[in-house]
Amino acid sequence: MAIERTFSIIKPNAVAKNVIGNIFARFEAAGFKIVGTKMLHLTVEQARGFYAEHDGKPFFDGLVEFMTSGPIVVSVLESENAVQRHRDLLGATNPANALAGTLRADYADSFTENGTHGSDSLESAQREIAYFFGEGEVCPRTR
């Protein structure tokens, strides 16, 4: 099976809980290589652009407000079947439905403040990685 890349966000509520290291450790324990990462504080324009597919939906403004409420950590993860394996590790989008031991079961506060984001397809991963990472900011791991 080919190595894939996926995109991950540790959202403001999880950053505020000081669990970045715990989440990274779980990524690595699950076999992911972290090949790009940075912390940033989204502007309203960045958040609206990233979540543009949800513009017009009832939750959009609240999502933008939440995602700009504090710093986030964006990362590029690499492994076989990365997109699906990462989504499995995150758990259900609604933390009320997330299985025990998933990141959302452990770190989410609500449906909107669900602690983490993960790409839902390879196409989304490519688009989302390009949104936050420029040329040379993702470093393939060779060891």
From Swiss-Prot:
What is catalyzed by this enzyme? a 2'-deoxyribonucleoside 5'-diphosphate + ATP = a 2'-deoxyribonucleoside 5'-triphosphate + ADP; a ribonucleoside 5'-diphosphate + ATP = a ribonucleoside 5'-triphosphate + ADP
Fetch the Gene3D superfamilies from UniProt: Nucleoside diphosphate kinase-like domain
A biological process term (GO) from this entry: GTP biosynthetic process
One molecular function GO term is: metal ion binding
Q: Does the record's keyword annotation contain ATP-binding? A: yes
Q: Which residues hold ATP?
A: K11, F59, R87, T93, R104, N114
Q: Which residues form the active site?
A: H117
* GO CC entries: cytoplasm
Q: Which EC numbers characterise this protein's activity in its record?
A: 2.7.4.6
Q: Which domain of life is it from?
A: Bacteria
Kindly state which keywords UniProt assigns to this record, in alphabetical order. ATP-binding, Cytoplasm, Kinase, Magnesium, Metal-binding, Nucleotide metabolism, Nucleotide-binding, Phosphoprotein, Transferase
Q: Which SUPFAM superfamilies match?
A: Nucleoside diphosphate kinase, NDK
Indicate where this protein resides in the cell.
Cytoplasm
Which interval of the chain is the signal sequence? none
Q: Tell me, in a sentence or two, what this protein's role is.
A: Major role in the synthesis of nucleoside triphosphates other than ATP. The ATP gamma phosphate is transferred to the NDP beta phosphate via a ping-pong mechanism, using a phosphorylated active-site intermediate.
Oligomeric state and interaction partners are given as:
Homotetramer.
Similarity-based family: Belongs to the NDK family.
> Which NCBIfam families does the record match to this protein?
PRK00668.1
Record protein name field: Nucleoside diphosphate kinase
